[in-house]
Each structure stands twice: as structure tokens, then as C-alpha cells.
Amino acid sequence: MSSDNFPLLDIPELVTCLQECDFSLATIQNVERPSSQFVITLYKQIIDTFMGVSPDSLLEDSRNFVENGDTSEQEVYDASLVYHDTLKILALNKICYKFFLDIGVSDFNVMDLYKPDPHRTRRFLSAVANYARFREEAMLELDGDQHPDGVRYLEQTDKLLKELRLKFDANNLLHSRVQKYKEFQKSDDLEALESDNKNMESELRHLNQVQETLTVDYERYKAEKQRHLSELETLGYELIELESERDKLRKYSQTDAEVLRKGVRELSLLLEQQQVQLEKLEQKQKNLQISFETFQASTQELYEVLQIVSTDLQDSHLKESTLLDAKHKLMQNHKNLNNLLSAGIMAKITLLQEQLDSQKRKLAELELNTQAKESENSATLKRLRKQHTDDVLPEVRNIEQRYKTKVADTITNYESQMRNIKVDFDNEVALIENECSLLFNHIKNYMTTIGEKLG
């Protein structure tokens, strides 16, 4: 990305602008494929047009001054003729560098004269074209009474130019006197030469002072010129901004008040609709928050119910284990009873009857506890089912229904298992009672038989 403060122009636009500035040498072919001779000639014309300085004339003035000097200076100058072309290029390079630096390009070098690059040449010429446009626009703005600062600037510039011309005239006069004194040096009158030499030295000192004053004034003039150009550029930017603000205000002033009021009413209505929609969304958000909290509470209660059911299931397993132990004990008692019958010990029959009665009481208590737990679980399930039906959202109902169905199926399975265990237990008790009855009958018969035998 270029860091220049001016736009890079297209070649047709660039050529048109340069030809409008009387640079007829600038053609599309020459700009696209620049040669050293083309750029040197074109840059000389540009420097002569915009700075009023001709590099060739500067070198010619220097040569004329040396040719009119003494013999030693003439010999040095003759030796330097060998490098005359090089001096011309170096002088042009120095002047071009200063000129392009003033218009915003700081990387001009001597290779841009010897071996010009098409892109760099286009960039330099774009800077010249933009500078020419800026000068033309600035002169149009400064023309007449439209810009008082511009008028003062032109008057001050004319004044400085007049002073500069006067000082150049004085400088030329002093040069002519020096030349005359050099001619006097060729005479044989030693005293006249010494007097003329002193006068010449005095004039030279005065000339040096005038030259220094001229240099200081010229530098001051350049600084003043640069300051005025900066002020002019700033005023141009301010003018553009003010024109833009004026166009905006004019647009607003031409707008119909009824249209503005209608737009305000439409915007107010739109604002009210947006506020109503916002309130609805906030209410929906609150409802969702309440539903979410209810769902969390229901989920927590469901977890607690599952824990209770799990505890009940563990109790059922424990009771089942107790029943199995009781069954095992009954079977063991049956075996012991058979052993007692075979051994003829009647005392243990009474103990067996007591154990049987104790097991019946435990079985009755177990049935009562089981019925109480079943009633409590049924009431809890009914309450949970009612709460799920009334409070939970339809999506959550499906989830909870699956949980409740699973729990109900589990409880039903356990109830069925408990009923089966109870039936088995009742059957075993009946079987034991029948066996006990048969045993009593056998014992009675046995005792009767023994009594008959003893009697």
C-alpha cells in the first residue's frame, strides 16, 4: 500500500493533465516505456515551469563567469569540461530532488534519470499533475475578492518578488564591478591595482553581506510561502466541510414537517409494539423459569420416591430372606421332629408346637406390616401421580410417566413375588399342620398300642 499523500493517476489521465500543462513531450508511449533522454528533458521542462530555474542556464552562467576570470580558474574549468554532462545530470538530480521533496516525494535519486522505472516515473509524474491541479485550484480560490487572505498573500508575494529582483539586480551590478576590477588587474599601475584591489575587496565583502541578506530573505520567503500554502490547504478543507454541513442543513430545512411528524408517529408506534413484544417475551421467560423450577422440584421428589421405593424393596428382600429362613427352620424342625419321633421323646413335641405358634404369629405380623407398607406405597404413588398430572409440563409428564410406570411395574412384580411367597408359605404351613396332625394320630395310636401291650 502506497504511503504517498496524493493519488496515483492512470496513464491516460496523467498524459492528459501533463499536456494541459504544455508538456507536449508526455505521451502514453513515453510514459509507459520511459527513456533516460525523455525523463531528463521532461524534468527540465517541469523544473523550468514550476520553479523558474533552468539547470542548463545555471551551468552556462557558471561557465561564462569562469571564462571571464583569471587564468587559473580558466584552467580548472577547462579540466572540468570532461565531466560537463555528468555535472548537468547531477545538478538536475539535485534540483529535481528538492522539487519532488517539496511536493510530497522524498525518494528521488539519480537512477530515476539514468534508468527510469515505469512505475516510479508514473508516480513522480502523478505528483507533478496533482501539484499542478492544486496550484490551479488555489489560484482560482485566490482570484478576486473571494478570499481576503489570498489577496494579502498575493500582495505579500509580489512585494517579496520585487525585493528579490532588486537584490538580484544589485548582485548583477556587483558582479559587473568585480569583472571591471579584474580587467583593471591587467594594467601596469601597481598603486591603482592595489587601490582597486582594496575597493574590490570592500565591494566583495559588501556583496557577501548582500548575498547573505538575500539568502536569509529568500529562506524567509520560502517559509512564509509554505506557511501560506498550509493555511490555504487548511482553509480549503474547512470550506469543503462547511459546504458539506450546509448541504445537510439545507436538506433538513427542505424536509416537510408533516413528513417528519408522520415518521415520528410511526417510530413511536413501532417502539410501543417492540415494548409489548418485549413484555411478552419477558413473561414467557418467567413462565419458562417457573416451569423449570417446578420440573427440578418434581425431579427431586421423584428421586426421593425412588429412594423410598428402593428402601421398601430392600425391606421386602429382607422379609423374603426372613421367610426363607423361617421355612428353613420349619424344615429343620420337621427333621428334628422326625428324629424325636424316631427316638420316642415326647417333650420336644410341645416345643415344636410352641415354635409353630411363634412362626404363625410372626407370619401374621409380617402380613400386617406388608399390608401397611402396601397401603403407604399406594397412597404415595397416588399422591405423586396426582402431582405429576397437575403440575408438570407435557414433556416432563412423559418422562415421569415412564419412571412411574417402571416403578409401578417393579412394585407389582415385587407384590406378585410376595403373594407367591405367601402362597408357598401357606401351603408349607398347611402341609406342616397336616404332617403334625398325622404325627399326633400316629403318636396317639402308638401310645394306645403300647398301653394295650402293657395292660
From Swiss-Prot:
User: Which keywords label this protein?
Assistant: Cell cycle, Cell division, Centromere, Chromosome, Coiled coil, Kinetochore, Mitosis, Nucleus
Instruction: State its location(s).
Output: Nucleus; Chromosome, Centromere, Kinetochore
Cell division is among the record's keywords? yes
Pfam families, sorted? Nuf2 (PF03800)
Q: Which ranges of the sequence are coiled-coil?
A: 184-298, 343-380
Q: Which residues form the signal peptide?
A: none
- The answer to whether the entry has keyword Nucleus is yes
Write down the superkingdom of origin.
Eukaryota
Quaternary structure annotation from Swiss-Prot or TrEMBL: Component of the NDC80 complex, which consists of NDC80, NUF2, SPC24 and SPC25.
Name listed for the protein in its UniProt record: Probable kinetochore protein NUF2
Q: Which organism is it from?
A: Eremothecium gossypii (strain ATCC 10895 / CBS 109.51 / FGSC 9923 / NRRL Y-1056)
